[in-house]
Amino acid sequence: MKSVWRTLAIALLASLLLACADQRRHTRAVYLLVDTSGTYAIELEKGQHVINYLLGTLNPGDSFAVARVKSRSFSEKDIIAKVTFSKDPLQANQQKKQFKDKTLALKQQVKGGSAYTDITGGLLQAAEFLNETGAGRKTILIFSDMQEELDKQTMRNVPMNMTGIRVVAINVTKLHTDNIDPRR
């Protein structure tokens, strides 16, 4: 009889301890949008430094994607590399090396820049990727001059659900046109 009570007490204590455990997800997901348009293509080397830094800070189980902002209609083909790192640290390090190798080719792929810059389309794609990962902390980094250039056919008045996603613009450069009309 004592052993039954002892077993019940241990089971009750174990269930109470499990109920008090931290239920948050601690994985991170980062989506980096790199502007490769004509006005910003010269900054790509700095973008590679950002990628290298992020690879050093991400942990096993985290997710990372890098996409170029170049076309007027952002799509899956603009994603250069994406990965969810393995829980095994050795395998995660190997995945980081492969990821870095994929992104090193970015500078060679960009020749002269593009005529259009669909930042809003990139944000929509990034939010979709981040929400699919199920990560606890989601961040979109925009490496751009923030000059969105769309043709008259491209419509971007769609609602964006960015709930739970941090959006940070980095290395934003001042353009000559900013002095002409600062509201842009």
Whereabouts are the PLM-identified features?
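Second-shell loop/turn segments in exported
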Residues: 35-43, 105-116, 178-183
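N-terminal post-signal-peptidase region of extra-cytosolic proteins
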Residues: 47-53, 125, 150-156
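Bacterial N-terminal signal peptides that target proteins for export
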Residues: 1-9
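Von Willebrand factor
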Residues: 26-137, 139-143, 172-175
